[in-house]
Amino acid sequence: MATQPVQNRNALYHIFKQTALYEKMLRWAWLQETRIREEEKRIFTREAREQFGKGAPHGSFADYKDALRRHRVTYQEYMYGYEYWKLDEAARDAFISRSEMQCIYRKIVTREVRQTFRNKTAFLERFAPFVHREWRMADGCSMEEFRAFVEAHDVIAKPLDGTCGEGIFKICASEVQDWESLYARCRDRHLLLEECVRACEPIEQLHPASLNTIRVVTLSQGDKFTVFGALLRMGAGGSVIDNTHAGGVFAPINPETGCIDTPAIDAHNHHYERHPDTDVPIVGFTIPYWEQIVETCRKAARVMPDLRFAGWDLCPLADGRIELIEGNHAPDFDGGLQAPLKVGVKQKLKESAGEIFGINVLELIKPTSKTYNHYEGML
């Protein structure tokens, strides 16, 4: 009996798909995608023109424009991420750019998934079984409650809709001089307050100031699940966050073994066999509790059967528990999955997504009216 409402909705949706209104909605979505492509082209071209005008170290503006036309790459991807300037066309085609991945995400990631993952509190509530730390909203507590929360443990303050580590800072009670102004700042900015957790010792020693999270990229639908790739993100320079945008470094993890077999890399394509600050070896490092981390991702993916893509940020804690920190419904493929080894994953993505989703996701990149049926995620 429980499946009857779902069956009824599916039947009604099938009827709706035969109507002229549905076709018009798909046409609107296609026009939106076309607009996005043109805007990307303008922005990327302007950035590249400025960089080449300053004296770019490699390649040429003409070659970049050709790469942009064919593969929708940014200047960063062309110059540093994938080093397109040194590749022939066959080698370039092995990579999938961030813009191409975003095109896929727009078309097949559902609105429910987007809304859940974009809002940090909605995510924490939906995936509560995998979150062990305390948290609260600054604008949802009094001054006294705010102070008691901070005095109980160090706190990380985050914007609700922040990305790339922007706007994140750490609060230590011993360093607070004006509680009222700090509370007002957090409350007025609607910041999320989270208890600071400690990673297990092997992870922590890499860079003690930051948590050093593990990003696991998964593909899933229903009971189907696979780990597509993973990387260890480490802070640097004493930063409390481990994002590359804040100067952090990252290293790809072998999904089969949980080991790091190759050097880490930063946003400027510098490679590190040892951490640049602590000198702790990175190559040969084995992620503690790797099997439990993968199993946590598998269980979390089942919470939303139509999740499809996810980038899970996790960390094994000092007590052995696996802590889910954040999630991303549109994980980057341009970082740890392709850049460190300069090896493209386009064909691997086609094969893995075909097994999980039953479609050729590379077809979703093509901007033709023939792909109208793939624009449902934008409605």
Outline where the language-model segments fall.
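Intrinsically disordered, low-structural-confidence terminal and linker regions
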Residues: M1-I36
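C-terminal active-site "lid" helix and adjoining low-complexity regulatory extension at the edge
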Residues: V6, N10, H14, E273-Q292, ...
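Conserved N-proximal alpha/beta basic substrate-recognition cap immediately N-terminal to
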Residues: K24-F149, C297
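Active-site nucleotide/adenylate-binding loops and adjacent lid/helix of ATP-dependent enzymes
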Residues: C103-D223
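Protein kinase-like catalytic core scaffold
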Residues: V155, T226-F228, E323
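Short, surface-exposed beta-strand-loop junctions and turns on beta-sheet-rich folds
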Residues: T163, M234, A330-D332
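A long amphipathic alpha-helix within ATP-dependent nucleotide-binding catalytic cores
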Residues: V197, E201-H207, G229, R233-L317
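Hydrophobic residues embedded in beta-strands of well-ordered beta-sheets
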Residues: K224-F225, G258-I260, R321-I322
